[in-house]
């Protein structure tokens, strides 16, 4: 009986790049929907702007490099990068902010290093840090959840604010005019109050903490968690990085909270506020910029979880997701070098 002999690789998969990226984008939909419900149409407008600029920028770069434009645009990587950046910035941020960030992510961070698969840093997070450092006022001007706002940001007001069509419609028109709290996220509010000598208990009596974590933010994180679990089910990502981030952050926050609950934020607050779940399942799991081996992924994820806690607790930025991811990206090659699997035929020693 004759057997067919074929060269390697002998294991094939139907999960091509465009399929993986498409599934990631689809799994973002629950989080985007809940975020839009609580924070208005601005998220959708930012998303549309980011995707448009990302595709135009990628097409322009491919044209300059004499590469296949269609093949690059259809891998859907620009779609994911644009989506992650769009949901990370304030919904009513001016239009030029998302344009600058998207151009930086696609042209500088991604294509300047050679395109998909060659970038060292996560493009969306690198762009986020650039915007945060360069335009701190615009990047920290979050609107309050619509369930608490005095003025509802309908589509007309949203367009006026983002595109600055009318000076009377600025982001501060939609602030939360209760208890002196303005456009601050729960993490921002806690960070500011703790620096002023208030306890966490005193700070969480404010209206923005009408829920156990913060109005709206708990459900936004839950929605991204659901999307992340779907990706695990579809085997788009593996559990190591996400699990290590969540577990490490929970353990570190629990230790601090047990030591001094009046000065350290609770573990539930850390897990379900800010961009924790978005980072754990959609950002840190980027296969290009993360560690590759199972042990390496665990170390990589634990490092991100630890950095998120340390920067949130002792650093100058309330939500440390972007900084933690970029620092871990820098260490990914180092991690891979020291935890790489032993090759077959490797001699242990005498």
UniProtKB/Swiss-Prot annotation:
Main location: membrane
Top-tier EC class: translocase
Keyword check for NADP: no
Essential cofactor(s): FMN
Membrane topology: Multi-pass membrane protein
Subunit structure: The complex is composed of six subunits: RnfA, RnfB, RnfC, RnfD, RnfE and RnfG.
Matching PANTHER family: ELECTRON TRANSPORT COMPLEX PROTEIN RNFD, ION-TRANSLOCATING OXIDOREDUCTASE COMPLEX SUBUNIT D
Protein name: Ion-translocating oxidoreductase complex subunit D
Organism of derivation: Shewanella frigidimarina (strain NCIMB 400)
Gene name, Swiss-Prot/TrEMBL: rnfD
């Amino acid at each position: 009986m004759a057997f067919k002999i074929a060269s390697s690789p002998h294991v094939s998969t139907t999960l091509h790049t465009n399929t993986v990226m498409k599934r990631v984008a689809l799994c973002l939909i629950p989080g985007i929907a809940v975020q839009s419900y609580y924070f208005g149409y601005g998220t959708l407008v930012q998303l549309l702007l980011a995707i448009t600029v990302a595709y135009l920028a990628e097409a322009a770069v491919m044209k300059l490099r004499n590469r296949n434009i269609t093949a690059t645009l259809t891998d859907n990587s620009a779609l994911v990068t644009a989506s992650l950046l769009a949901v990370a910035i304030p919904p009513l941020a001016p239009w030029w902010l998302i344009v600058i960030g998207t151009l930086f992510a696609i042209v500088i961070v991604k294509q300047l290093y050679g395109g998909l698969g060659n970038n060292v840093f996560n493009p969306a997070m690198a762009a986020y840090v650039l915007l945060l450092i360069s335009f701190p006022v615009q990047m920290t001007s979050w609107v309050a959840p619509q369930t608490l706002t005095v003025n509802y940001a309908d589509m007309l007001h949203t367009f006026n604010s983002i595109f600055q069509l009318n000076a009377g419609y600025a982001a501060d028109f939609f602030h939360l005019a209760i208890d002196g709290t303005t456009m601050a996220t729960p993490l921002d509010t806690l960070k500011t109050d703790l620096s002023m000598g208030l306890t966490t208990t005193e700070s969480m009596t404010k209206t923005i903490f009408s829920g156990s974590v913060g109005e709206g933010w708990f459900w936004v994180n839950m929605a991204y968690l659901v999307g992340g679990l779907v990706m695990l089910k579809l085997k788009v990502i593996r559990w190591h990085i996400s699990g290590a981030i969540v577990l490490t952050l929970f353990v570190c926050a629990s230790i601090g909270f047990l030591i001094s609950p009046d000065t350290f934020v609770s573990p539930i607050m850390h897990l379900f506020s800010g961009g924790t779940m978005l980072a754990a399942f959609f950002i840190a799991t980027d296969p290009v910029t993360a560690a590759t081996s199972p042990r390496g992924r665990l170390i990589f994820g634990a490092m991100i979880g630890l950095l998120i806690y340390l920067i949130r607790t002792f650093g100058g930025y309330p939500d440390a997701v972007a900084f933690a991811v970029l620092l871990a990206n820098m260490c990914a090659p180092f991690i891979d070098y020291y935890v790489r699997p032993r090759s077959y035929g490797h001699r242990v020693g005498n």
